[in-house]
Amino acid sequence: MTVVVIDVVGLTRRLLPHMPALRSVADAGTCATLDTVFPALTCPVQSSLLTGSLPRQHGIVGNGWYFRDLGEPLLWRQHNALVGGEKVWDALRASTPGATVANVCWWYAMGAATDWTVTPRPVYYADGRKEPDFYTNPASLHDELAARIGGFPLFDYWGPTASIAASRWIVAAAERILARHRPDVLLVYVPHLDYDLQRYGPDGPQAAAAAAAIDIELTPLLEACQERGDQILALSEYGITAARRPVDINRALRRAGLLAVHTQDGMEYLDPWTSRAFAVADHQIAHIYVADPAEVARIRGIVKELPGVDEVLDTDGKAARGIDHPRSGELVAVAEPDAWFTYYYWLDDTRAPDFARVVDIHRKPGYDPVELFFDHAGPRRAKLRAATALARKKAGLRYLMNVVGLDASVVGGSHGRLPDSADDAPLLICSDPTLDKDRIAATEVKDLIVDLHRRVSC
């Protein structure tokens, strides 16, 4: 039997009533509040779930950070070597030699010592084209899945066309691996709730509809697990809360004479090498990197006065939150509950770099949820530009998919700070009723997975 760990992104008590299949697992088993880690972001929390440690130990301080040795802010790296500490698969094999693990789309999948790996990986052609694809290990799994369920729907995974199709594909891949390969532990990442809850917030009809939709997609997998006697562990890294106040932290640093840019072809680019301070914005937290230690206190005061900023963590504050790691900024800003940080650093939109208006998660020096929308300044024109660019792409011509706007006020929800309400905290649902806990720390989940495997193996 298998321990099936399903990361249902954004799952909270507020949404569970709209999810009858998951609710039935909770009713028959255990439903607990997951005490997440700070920052409550995808990569740090997943790393804590799988290592049983805090960011100060595993080193994943955000979805990205300033790589000081490279002089570049980089987000959404994929190699597992970035994550420090013992991983759950190492602990599992120490407990049960020969135990097997499959990872379907949890982050930092590449290079991990799992037995089966599936993760999004586009094809980057030499002529600049980007085409949907995915990476697997073993390599033969790629063709097996492609023949069975088709290619990975990359443009449904992120961007203005993000939809249920990506999660449907991921669940189908998980079902295939479970049925054919029967791993001892199966990790599955299901991102669908991330989309409309960031677009519209958690309180409207779109959130309820998204919860119901992903529950339908999960139902066959849950039923198959129940029939086989598998252990189901469904959880989330964070809850998404209403947040409609963007905070332009880098623009404030620039106006204070601290952030520097360089210009090419009329476009401004962040210059981290000569900046006295800049921020890597990541939802509701921002790592602020300060070149001169003597300026840290003054810069903290500047950022603390910005509307929408709740806290600015210094050395002691970072230690108290478990994020005192060399990759962290000298300061870490935390937004107020209804606010979030943009990465924008230009002061005139006509000087914005061309990547600002496209979906480009790797070139932007911070997270950009506005990528989930067609340009609100003219959505019809944006869709027409998309159609024109697609036609040029198919014709083998150069194209620019410039469909993303620069109006951050369109975003409806965010996450990253620790939850202020139990209704907004992430959940952990387990099919085993003997777990019998009201709260479980994210750092306890690694040991819980190993323990659940012992139970199903007996």
Where are the predicted features?
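Active-site-proximal N-terminal segment of extracellular/periplasmic enzymes that hydrolyze or transfer
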Residues: 1-31
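Residue-level preference for the first positions of well-ordered beta-strands
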Residues: 2-4, 184-187, 231, 330
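Short glycine/proline-rich, acidic loop/turn segments that cap or connect secondary-structure elements
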Residues: 186, 410-429
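C-terminal helical/tail subdomains of lipid-metabolizing enzymes
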Residues: 436-453
